[in-house]
Amino acid sequence: MKRHSFITQLASVAAVCGLTLAFASCANDDLAQNGKTSIDDKGLTAFSTGEPATRTTMEADGKFYWEAGDKIWVKDDNGNWKQSSNSPTGKTASFKFLMPGKYTAKSSYEVYYPGKNGNQNQVTISANQTQTEPNTTAHFGVSGDCGIAKATRNATSHEFEFTLDHKAAYLVFKPYTSNDVLKYCYLTKIEVTSDNDITDTYTLDPTAATGTGALTGTGNGKQIVLTTKGDYGSTFQNGFPLTNTSANLATNGAYMV
């Protein structure tokens, strides 16, 4: 699936506004194994994140964090898909997932993170995404962020440890303007159009891309719309301000999967 030949359209910003696009790479992130959980883990197997933290929302420096409600999927020894029985309750740099099922036949298992709207190894990249405040990627989980990993059993702790490899592509938008008139405007929507299909359902395939894994499938849509407005009554109900004369993520940084 090609994700790099985008034609960018800004629906709510005049063409004279400066726009800097930064591509965040889908790099491997290390994971930290200091996540805590209060769930009774009897009969469950721990799949832990190692060091330093790996996650599912992205900071401006490319680091990721797990978010509330994130879950992973693993096939057990009987070949049945199992979803983690617990999930983070808030933003955290690390977490210990507890998996139902039996995991004694092998020393390593494939781990799948299909996003919050995905299922098993099926990922849905949303054609309509919403970011309610500047410089946050808390919407990534419902927009199509995803990843796979190989979890390997630790001989000492007997827990499975893994490093999540994110497989989606990300766009970072940094709009600014030197036009005083436009400083009274707000960024409310960004539209990205590609000559390839970039939305709909894809499969996390750990054997693709010479064994490193990849999203496979053809998709079914060529446009993604990112709405950049908060809820009514919130600070950003009118959109993100365009008061900056140079790129400033804190003012109006926007992110798209």
Regions found by a protein language model. Give the residues of each.
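Sec-type signal peptide cleavage vicinity
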Residues: K2-V257
